[in-house]
Design a protein with these regions (language model features):
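Cationic-aromatic interfacial patches
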Residues: 10
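Patatin-like phospholipase
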Residues: 1-6, 14-144, 152-324
Length: 324
């Protein structure tokens, strides 16, 4: 330990005594699993960790997928039966995945955080394409609102140049039309029905991965922020249906209906945390690339009161330099 920054103990199921010793002296346990096998806890795994529950040793599950796998699946089944602090998906023989695993295990992970910003969110696509072209890599992804939508492409490991094509095909030119076109003619809950947004998200995800994809099935660890109006606080979503969670994070109050989750109402995450750099830092990222789309400017209006609709409309017809 005096001569090296890190020591790795390689255990062998045929030597249970050594396994116990290795775990007892470890600062972190890394479980490596063949993702094509049963998710059930093996006998050696149960024996290995059962005697050290009170040590609270951080545990990482590394799931190895066959080369060429389009998307992980059924990750939730693995996570539900064992206590791990994080999981990492890698493809056999994939140099980029191995480099990502190395950064995560050595505490050098790079996080990408995409802020909300309405229509400005399309800017994220250009930025991610530029990062990809420049060879800039990242290991964790997090986003709010529009950043949650665009961040899902990065989390699914969609190539930078393909993101724009898939986004336009799903959210603008898709078979259901524009996501802002499903007006609610009786806007009791919201201006838009919200159905198109969900279908468009499902279409984008199915094109790049699989239908009904869980957030835990993303190649890169991913979180989105929603605003829980039932508990009056932000809510971090890392598990559950990816399309549903993305819509929950981007449902602007009054414009789209809330997402009902476990009996609670979730709206656009921008109400509580529009630029969740703090959550990315808590996730363990050593370096963070943050993209904030909203200008940090204070704007004051020299008006005695809010104008009426007619006054505001007339003001729009004035020359730009004379508008109030």
């Amino acid at each position: 330990e005096l001569a090296h920054d890190a020591l790795y103990f390689i255990t062998d199921p045929s030597e249970p005594a050594w396994c116990q010793t290795a775990v007892h002296h470890s600062d972190e346990v890394v479980l490596v699993a063949d993702a094509t096998t049963s998710p059930d806890v093996t006998e050696i795994e149960a024996k290995l960790l059962s005697g050290h529950r009170n040590l609270r040793v951080p545990t990482t599950l590394v799931m190895v997928h066959p080369a060429g796998t389009k998307s992980p699946s059924d990750t939730a089944a693995w996570l539900d039966v064992r206590h791990v602090n994080r999981h990492v998906h890698i493809r056999a023989g994939h140099a980029g995945d191995m480099a990502r695993l190395s950064r995560i295990l050595s505490g050098r992970a790079i996080g990408l955080v995409l802020a909300g910003g309405g229509a400005r969110g399309l800017t994220h696509l250009g930025i991610m394409a530029a990062l990809d072209e420049a060879g800039v890599v990242f290991d964790y992804v997090g986003g709010t609102s529009a950043g949650a939508i665009m961040g899902s492409f990065a989390a699914m490991d969609v190539a930078g140049d393909k993101m724009k094509v898939v986004s336009r095909d799903s959210f603008v030119d898709g078979p259901i039309g524009s996501i802002t076109g499903d007006y609610n003619w009786v806007p009791y809950l919201s201006l838009l029905k919200g159905g198109r947004a969900l279908k468009a998200s499902e279409r984008a995800i199915a094109t790049n991965a699989t239908s009904n994809m869980d957030m835990a099935d993303c190649w890169k660890n991913y979180f989105v922020i929603a605003s829980n109006f039932s508990t009056h606080q932000e809510q971090i979503l890392t598990r559950g249906d990816l399309a549903v969670n993305v819509v929950a994070s981007s449902s602007i109050p009054g414009v789209m209906p809330p997402t009902l989750m476990d009996g609670e109402l979730l709206f656009d995450g921008g109400s509580f945390n529009n630029f969740p750099v703090d959550r990315m830092r808590a996730m363990g990222a050593a370096k963070i690339i943050g993209v904030d789309l909203l200008p940090d400017l204070d704007r004051r209006y020299e008006l005695p009161k809010i104008p009426t609709s007619g006054q505001a409309l007339r003001d729009r017809f004035r020359p730009r330099g004379k508008r109030r």
